[in-house]
């Protein structure tokens, strides 16, 4: 026992002397060995570790060189060999410091031979401290894309927080951002690459779209903000539309500052819309924007903000949804654009509101809607199939503009009926509407009819205000949980709209009232009388509720009918509709 104690004490003295020598040379390096030399009297076999944690802040950020070796407490020769090994490792580390600048120069070259040179003789183990806990060698080559897209490097340095920790401080900023982008692409983990790489996942074509996107530096900042808000939605919807997007170029990626991304799924629609280029740039802008709103239909719970709709385009859109398939057709009659742009200002807006029908839980804000178009919209829903047809008769638009101002308003409000949970705010809508709407529900379904003769316009505007309020409240009936706020709506236009719901089938038909109604004031009086004839065909219950509406008791006319045969109803309604349209 005494011999063992003496042996341990002698070993401790030897180690303390060596620790003093090491402390003079390497500072705090000897503390590890001296601190670990106090324990061999407790255990026969010990594990000694000498770590070198000196950080090269001037060249390599934060990395540590670790040397680990095992020492047997009973073997003096092995202890001496391990200490000699530690001294050799320290000498190699000093050599590696001398070659750091040469190593950085090797990183700058993009040649295959020099780019991948790793001076393994100088480093035993390099540990880069990061959150992921992964070990990376500092001799990695930067990405091959270095120098191709400098603006992309700036984005990668802005959006990646972990790349800031991986930067080599001795390198320049461009090299640091390139190395950070390369590590983020190859290793993944908790890295967050720049926005264009995460959203536009196109194989082998990311560089071209990145360069194309940076050409539009004027629109880039706003589009990045929009993408940051809708990143979860855009990633799911961008993937099936990459082929069409690459064909059209960067114009389909960045359209306007306030709009989201446009996915050109309908190439034929864009071709048809380009026919209006001969009439001016305004018409083309409006038609292109209508296609962007039409392509937004699969996005549920979307927040769409439309301000300052561009002027001068007629957009007739037809949606046929058969067994979950959507077919969009656009026909643009430009023969009546010579009468002026006032007739054509808001037809786009009505079509965009029509496309919002299938968007459940949508919040649509429409402000500053321009004046003057006739929008007759037809919805036929047969066995869960939705068919939307829009026909714009512009042959009588030259007779006046007041009649054409707000027919959009009634149609757009009617189109909101199927939007459950929608919040629609419409402000500053142009003036004038008599909304004659007929809804017939058969087999336990309500039937609503509102007929307002236009002869009341010459008596005053009070009757017309009540008429519009009744139609707007009628349109709120099918809005489950919908909140619609309509402000500053005034008078004077005719819009005949008919909705039929037959055995779960929804049909909205709107005849053309424009053939002979606006030739003069007498024609308006006759149309009002014809509307009175149609009103006389209603039941006593209809007339009673219609009178209650004007008395202020009710703002909505609800009439319930049960008809046995659908063909009979269609024939009777067509006969009743003929006096109004002629």
UniProtKB/Swiss-Prot annotation:
Residues 137-161, 174-190, 325-335, 385-395, 445-455, 487-498, 506-529 have a biased composition (Polar residues). It is found in: Secreted. Residues 50-59, 293-305, 336-345, 396-405, 456-465, 530-546 have a biased composition (Basic and acidic residues). It comes from the Eukaryota. Keywords: Repeat, Secreted, Signal. Residues 1-23 form the signal peptide. Residues 92-134 have a biased composition (Basic residues). One of its GO terms (biological process) is negative regulation of flagellated sperm motility. Its main location: secreted. Residues 25-62, 91-190, 272-553 are annotated as: Disordered. GO terms for cellular component: extracellular exosome. The keyword Membrane does not apply. PANTHER family: SEMENOGELIN-2 (PTHR10547:SF6), SEMENOGELIN/SEMINAL VESICLE SECRETORY PROTEIN (PTHR10547). Interacts with SERPINA5. Participates in the formation of a gel matrix (sperm coagulum) entrapping the accessory gland secretions and ejaculated spermatozoa. Belongs to the semenogelin family. This is Semenogelin-2. It comes from Macaca fascicularis (Crab-eating macaque). The gene is SEMG2.
């Amino acid at each position: 026992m005494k011999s063992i104690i003496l042996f341990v004490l002698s070993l401790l003295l030897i180690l303390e002397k060596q620790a003093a020598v090491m402390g003079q040379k390497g500072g705090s390096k000897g503390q590890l060995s001296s601190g670990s030399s106090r324990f061999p009297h407790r255990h026969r076999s010990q594990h000694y570790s000498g770590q070198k944690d000196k950080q090269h802040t001037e060249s390599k950020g934060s990395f540590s060189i670790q040397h680990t070796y095992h020492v047997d407490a009973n073997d003096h020769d092995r202890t001496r060999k391990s200490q000699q090994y530690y001294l050799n490792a320290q000498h190699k580390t000093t050599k590696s410091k001398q070659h750091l600048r040469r190593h950085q120069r090797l990183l700058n070259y993009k040649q295959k031979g020099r780019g991948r040179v790793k001076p393994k003789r100088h480093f035993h183990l390099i540990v880069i401290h990061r959150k992921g806990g992964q070990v990376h060698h500092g001799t990695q080559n930067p990405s091959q894309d270095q120098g191709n897209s400098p603006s992309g490097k700036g984005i990668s340095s802005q959006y990646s927080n972990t790349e800031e920790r991986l930067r080599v401080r001795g390198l320049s900023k461009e090299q640091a951002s390139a190395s950070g982008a390369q590590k983020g692409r190859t290793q993944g983990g908790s890295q967050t690459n720049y926005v264009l790489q995460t959203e536009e996942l196109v194989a082998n074509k990311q560089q071209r779209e990145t360069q194309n996107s940076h050409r539009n530096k004027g629109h880039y900042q706003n589009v990045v903000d929009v993408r940051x808000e809708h990143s979860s939605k855009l990633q799911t919807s961008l993937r099936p539309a990459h082929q069409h997007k690459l064909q059209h170029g960067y114009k389909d990626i960045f359209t306007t500052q306030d709009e989201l991304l446009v996915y050109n799924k309908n190439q034929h629609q864009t071709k048809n819309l380009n026919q209006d280029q001969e009439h001016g740039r305004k018409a083309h802008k409006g038609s292109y924007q209508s296609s962007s709103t039409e392509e937004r239909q699969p996005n549920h719970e979307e927040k769409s903000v439309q301000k300052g709709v561009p002027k001068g385009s007629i957009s007739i859109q037809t949606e046929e949804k058969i067994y979950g398939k959507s077919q969009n057709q656009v026909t643009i009659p430009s023969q009546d654009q010579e009468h002026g742009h006032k007739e054509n200002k808001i037809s786009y807006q009505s079509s965009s509101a029509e496309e919002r029908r299938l968007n459940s839980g949508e919040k649509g804000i429409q402000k500053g809607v321009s004046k003057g178009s006739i929008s007759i919209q037809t919805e036929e829903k047969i066995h869960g199939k939705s068919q939307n047809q829009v026909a714009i008769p512009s042959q009588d638009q030259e007779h006046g503009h007041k009649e054409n101002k707000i027919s959009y308003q009634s149609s757009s409000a009617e189109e909101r009926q199927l939007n459950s949970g929608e919040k629609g705010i419409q402000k500053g809508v142009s003036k004038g509407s008599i909304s004659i709407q007929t809804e017939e529900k058969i087999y336990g379904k309500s039937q609503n009819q509102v007929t307002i003769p236009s002869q009341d316009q010459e008596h005053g505007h009070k009757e017309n205000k009540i008429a519009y309020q009744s139609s707007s409240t009628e349109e709120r009936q099918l809005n489950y949980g919908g909140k619609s706020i309509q402000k500053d709506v005034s008078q004077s236009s005719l819009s005949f709209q008919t909705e039929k719901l037959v055995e779960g089938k929804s049909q909205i038909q709107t005849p053309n009232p424009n053939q002979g109604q606006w030739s003069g004031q007498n024609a308006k009086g006759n149309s009002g009388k014809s509307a009175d004839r149609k009103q006389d065909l209603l039941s006593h219950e209809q007339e009673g509720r219609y009178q209650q509406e004007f008395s202020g008791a009710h703002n909505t006319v609800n009439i319930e009918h049960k008809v046995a045969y659908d063909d009979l109803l269609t024939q009777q309604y067509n006969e009743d509709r003929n006096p109004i349209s002629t």
